[in-house]
Swiss-Prot record:
One of its GO terms (cellular component) is cytosol. It comes from Gluconacetobacter diazotrophicus (strain ATCC 49037 / DSM 5601 / CCUG 37298 / CIP 103539 / LMG 7603 / PAl5). Belongs to the SAICAR synthetase family. InterPro entries: SAICAR_synt/ADE2_N, SAICAR_synt_PurC, SAICAR_synth, SAICAR_synthetase, SAICAR_synthetase_CS. Pathway: Purine metabolism; IMP biosynthesis via de novo pathway; 5-amino-1-(5-phospho-D-ribosyl)imidazole-4-carboxamide from 5-amino-1-(5-phospho-D-ribosyl)imidazole-4-carboxylate: step 1/2. One of its GO terms (molecular function) is phosphoribosylaminoimidazolesuccinocarboxamide synthase activity. Keywords: ATP-binding, Ligase, Nucleotide-binding, Purine biosynthesis. It catalyses: 5-amino-1-(5-phospho-D-ribosyl)imidazole-4-carboxylate + L-aspartate + ATP = (2S)-2-[5-amino-1-(5-phospho-beta-D-ribosyl)imidazole-4-carboxamido]succinate + ADP + phosphate + 2 H(+). Its EC number is 6.3.2.6. NCBIfam families: purC (TIGR00081). One of its GO terms (biological process) is 'de novo' IMP biosynthetic process. This is Phosphoribosylaminoimidazole-succinocarboxamide synthase.
Length: 254
């Protein structure tokens, strides 16, 4: 296995130096967290499934012209991505009331919202990722108005496409979180979709039964977490057959 220099480790992924300038290797872990890291656990095989699911969805988005950092999947747990300057915001898209929105506004969970709602959260673990407004974002220089316009346009297109895709396999896209980055190509910069799209950062409910098929099963101690992730992959037609060697992490060069 190739020896790579580790650059960053987050809750669910590790970033390594890529084989070429301007590239990184993104490794998907089985670690699971909730409550901004207050609850921790392991979901066996989660990294393998999320790698495949995110690859599939990123490629489908690329097909309709949405720029992403994804280049290609390397193996069961790793993918090659473009190195981008991450914008320190989480863009949350809500189609159905659930989670913090339902609690904060007293809306019964499962209520279809009058229209899609976009929220912004400042990425800062020590502050518990506070919700912020466009005024905060531009005032503190996290993103300019033009960047935000691009992010919103890409977010709405992504939501429209993914909502339809999931409807086609009997799943409701309740809400999800996106992250964006600035991709520099010489003097030119464009906003691209980054991070991942998986049951880790999407709320996915069975369209008929409203059974949760996402990380809420871990957050709420509902059990059958692995099975839920497998169900999503199976419906997408990409359920992988992992071997023991696929479950090992990469060899790290200190």
């Amino acid at each position: 296995m190739a020896r790579r220099r580790q650059l960053y480790e987050g809750k669910a992924k590790i970033l390594f130096e890529g084989p070429e300038p301007g590239t990184l290797v993104q490794y998907f872990k089985d670690d699971a967290t909730a409550g901004n890291g207050a609850k921790k656990g392991i979901i066996t095989g989660k990294g393998v499934l999320n790698n495949r699911i995110s690859e599939h969805l990123m490629l489908r988005l690329h097909d309709i012209g949405i720029p992403t950092h994804f280049i290609r999947r390397l193996n069961m747990r790793e993918q090659l991505i473009r190195e981008v300057e991450i914008i320190p915001l989480e863009v949350v898209v809500r189609n159905v009331a659930a989670g913090s929105l339902a609690k904060r506004l007293g809306i019964p969970e499962g209520t279809r919202l009058p229209r899609t709602i976009i929220e912004y959260y400042y990425k800062n673990d020590s502050l518990n990722d506070p919700m912020v407004s466009e005024e905060h974002i531009t005032a503190f220089g996290w993103a300019c108005t033009h960047d935000l316009d691009d992010m919103v346009a890409l977010t709405m297109r992504t939501n429209d496409f993914l909502s339809g895709l999931f409807v086609g396999i009997g799943i409701t896209l309740v809400d999800f979180k996106l992250e964006f980055g600035r991709l520099w190509e010489g003097e030119d910069m464009r906003i691209v979709l980054a991070d991942e799209i998986s049951p880790d950062n999407c709320r996915l409910w069975d369209a008929k039964t409203s059974e949760k098929l996402d990380k809420d099963r871990f957050r709420r101690d509902m059990g059958r977490v692995e099975e839920a992730y497998q169900e999503v992959a199976w419906r997408l037609g990409i359920l992988p057959e992992a071997t023991n060697s696929d479950m090992k992490g990469p060899e790290v060069m200190q």
